């Protein structure tokens, strides 16, 4: 197998490859662009006009998605997966991946859409580099631009695999993309309603790609992801890469749960208190009248919505950041 097929090994070792461009036996081009960044270009006769960005490891301890991308890269390098799409593989936060930690200094997935300009340090620099890599990759016009940013969650979830669909002014959510997610094993999608500061929010809002954050189970160390079943997603990505995917049918979205953001819970001070157990699962239902959180100055978050559920509760975020999201069932 080509040396560039071992992108994860190179990244974990912090090494640059001797050869930064290699060709597979059938002419597929592998190009090491930067640490943790590999661009795959199919031979011209097979190119189907799709540009697919696959990122993982924005949080360094979320290893199941990293392992998934590593398997895909190795198949491409070995010639068993023959791309028809251009693919950019990104391991987002190499130093955090090496340490096995969520992040080193700052949560990188809060540093996109210009937020890195307000910060400093390794994660801010890397977020800017990832934006640049994505911008160059998606600069070819008249092509399909698609981005999946793969994650696992700090906690368990009542809905194991779900997606977050960013928002941008004047754009509608795509039914065919929702159908593609459903076919890949995604059980629910959260339709966001304002600009975000995540990697997928950047590629969706600034670069015009169809982009999603995929939450795929609970975060575990390398080699301990047997309970995270990514078989359907992996097969769907292989079909996207080799161009043999059937066009998803967006006319019916049976089996896919849709949610919208009702409110974000923002932590304003060190006095913030979230009235949930530490092990509460994502998508836990909360009854109207429930006192969810309190903060300085008598600020209270009381559940008013019928059918409300909580996702990403985290009272340990920095002041000014989101400590949870209340979501409610939605329709397109």
Curated annotation (Swiss-Prot):
The alphabetized UniProt keywords are:
Arginine metabolism, Hydrolase, Metal-binding, Zinc
The pathway that the record names for this protein is: Amino-acid degradation; L-arginine degradation via AST pathway; L-glutamate and succinate from L-arginine: step 5/5
InterPro entries reported in the protein's UniProt record: AspA/AstE_fam (IPR050178), AstE_AspA_cat (IPR055438), Aste_AspA_hybrid_dom (IPR007036), SuccinylGlu_desuccinylase (IPR016681)
The enzyme's first-digit EC class, named in words, is hydrolase
Q: Name one Pfam family in it.
A: AstE_AspA_cat
Query: Where are the membrane-spanning stretches?
Result: none
Biological-process GO terms, alphabetical: arginine catabolic process to glutamate; arginine catabolic process to succinate
Q: Which cofactor does it need?
A: Zn(2+)
* The protein's Enzyme Commission number: 3.5.1.96
**Residues annotated to bind Zn(2+):** 59, 62, 151
Q: Which family does it belong to?
A: Belongs to the AspA/AstE family. Succinylglutamate desuccinylase subfamily.
Instruction: Please give the name of this protein.
Output: Succinylglutamate desuccinylase
This protein's species is: Pseudomonas aeruginosa (strain UCBPP-PA14)
Species lineage: Bacteria, Pseudomonadati, Pseudomonadota, Gammaproteobacteria, Pseudomonadales
């Amino acid at each position: 197998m080509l040396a560039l097929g071992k992108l994860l090994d190179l990244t974990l070792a912090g090494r640059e490859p001797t050869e930064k461009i290699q060709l597979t036996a059938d002419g597929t081009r592998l190009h090491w662009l930067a640490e943790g960044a590999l661009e795959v270009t199919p031979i011209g006769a097979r190119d189907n006009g799709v540009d697919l960005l696959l990122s993982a490891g924005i949080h360094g301890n979320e290893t199941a998605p990293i392992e998934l991308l590593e398997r895909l890269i190795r198949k491409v390098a070995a010639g068993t997966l023959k791309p028809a799409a251009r693919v950019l593989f990104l391991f987002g936060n190499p130093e955090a991946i090496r340490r096995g930690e969520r992040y080193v200094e700052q949560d990188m997935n809060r540093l996109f859409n210009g937020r890195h300009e307000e910060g400093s340090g390794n994660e801010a620099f890397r977020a800017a580099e990832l934006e640049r890599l994505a911008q160059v990759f998606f600069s070819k016009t008249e092509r399909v631009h698609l981005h999946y940013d793969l994650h696992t969650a700090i906690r368990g979830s009542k809905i194991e695999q779900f997606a977050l669909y960013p928002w941008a002014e004047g754009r509608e959510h795509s039914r065919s993309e929702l159908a593609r997610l459903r076919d890949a094993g995604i059980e629910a999608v959260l339709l966001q309603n304002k600009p975000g500061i995540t990697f997928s929010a950047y590629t969706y809002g600034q670069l015009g790609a169809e982009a999603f954050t995929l939450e795929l189970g609970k975060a575990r160390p390398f080699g301990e992801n047997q309970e995270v079943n990514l078989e359907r997603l992996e097969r769907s990505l292989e079909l996207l890469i080799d161009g043999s995917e059937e066009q998803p049918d967006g006319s019916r979205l049976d089996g896919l749960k849709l949610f919208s953001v009702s409110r974000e819970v923002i932590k304003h001070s060190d006095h913030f208190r979230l009235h949930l157990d530490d092990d509460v699962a994502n998508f836990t239902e909360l009854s109207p009248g429930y006192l969810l959180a309190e903060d300085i100055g008598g600020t209270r978050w009381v559940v008013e919505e019928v059918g409300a559920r909580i996702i990403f509760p985290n009272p340990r975020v920095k002041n000014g950041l989101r400590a949870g999201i209340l979501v409610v069932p939605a329709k397109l």
